[in-house]
Amino acid sequence: MLFDVWGSDTLIHWAGWAMVFIGLIVLNEVGRRTKLGAAIIFGVAPLAMTIYCVAIAIGVSQGAEWALTNPTHVYQNSWFHYAKVYAALAGCWGFIAIKYQWGKIGKAHWFRAWPFVIVAINIMIAVVSDFESAYHFFVLGQSTWVTSEGATQLAGWNNVFNGIAGIINIFCMTGWWSVYASEDKTDMLWPDMTWVYIIAYDIWNFCYTYNCLPTHSWFCGFALLLAPTVAAFIWNKGGWIQNRAFTLAIWCMFAQVFPYFQEESIFVTHSTLDPGAATAVSIAALVANIAAIIYIAYRAKKLGRNPYKQDVFEGTSDLEKATARRAKVDYAHAE
């Protein structure tokens, strides 16, 4: 069993999960469909969060009791959470610039590699966190350890397997410059990022949250990963990476300001901290990403293409449906 969800509080656990899942899908749609929605969600909200967090940091530095006991300081004070939320927001604004074709940068050929760069950075943030946990096992001899936020993590080969899976996952991204705006300007599209990558990424990232965010994984691993994937598979073909960035930023901001929801509310759902489950999930992540990179290499060889400079999933249903949505813009000659 991965989570403590079965028992007298089962309905409450699932209700909390459903609230997060549905909320992320709805807010993602607001952010992608309107400029005003994007401005509020990815402009006003981050500014308010930053002011709030800076105020807490100042209070902590002065030894203020209200700041020292604030849930954001108690539960969200590690480097990881701040790195993740601002990296996600950087991705969002880059994607928005591309989909609205803002100025020279929005149409520039070189900037179309931005999605690859920011996703790789986000993945490496998680990989470093996994290896940080592995350090506690291999160097400090700790099979479990408690973070600065009071979360107990399992440490061991599960971190190594998943860290390697994350590194492989970076190279499973193909067609780095094949990124476009949709004709209706609701989405930034990455057609060559098909189900092959999405599934490999989701398994890896779920394992990361299970390893390193055991008190949050029910929400940030299960609900947060499923929301953008459902959208991409059903109604937003080619837009998965934008869905992922938007929902990740939304969740990270919410969790940073309202950690009470996942830490102390009636909806709290913890992982079982079962070493066997953690190892099994990490092996699944590694196998999935090895399988993905092998399949990508096979298609690249079959089509005679460089998988990073060219599309390797040309001819597949996913790519063709996504490509049909792209705007008629001559990116090759954009300054």
Predicted regions located by residue number:
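Alpha-helical transmembrane segments of polytopic membrane proteins
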Residues: S8-V20, A45, H73-W93, R112-A126, ...
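Generic multipass alpha-helical transmembrane bundles of integral membrane proteins
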Residues: I105-G238
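Short, structured coil/loop segments at alpha-helix boundaries
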Residues: G31-L36, K104-A108, L154, F161, ...
